[in-house]
Amino acid sequence: MPSVEKPVVLLIDDNEATCTLITAVLHRDFLVEIAADGQDGIERLRTKRYDVIILDLRMPQPDGFAVLEFLEQHDKRRLRSVLVVTAALTAPEMARAKAFDICGLIGKPFDVDALLDAVKQCAVSSGDGNPIGNVLSSGVILLLADLIRARLM
């Protein structure tokens, strides 16, 4: 069966345990790159396009809001691929994050199935050239074709 290129996720979070968990949840469907803080995330965003950006807002400077501001200034369309995954947001912070026209927001601790569904939805709605919907559809079609061939033999 031909290989299907996985969408690439940039995970920007300073918590190593969170990064390990999210990577484990996503590894089957996505390639995950990790940026350990906002500055590292901004540097990666300057040089590469990602299908989905998972962003923690509560990090040492620069925080996640600085990353959102960078995207708003340099390529507003990429905000649609941002899924904020963060803890203990106040109502004003939540409103501020949503004002950036992000794909979604999930609180920590999170349900792993809800996270996976949200990341897939962000990949589809981001509008980039490699939406997960097309990738998964292609993979499903190829798998079905293999199953049909196996039954006919």
PLM feature segments, named:
Residues 16-33, 100:
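Two-component/phosphorelay signaling modules centered on CheY-like receiver
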Residues 34-52:
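Acidic, metal-coordinating helix/loop segments flanking the phosphotransfer/catalytic sites
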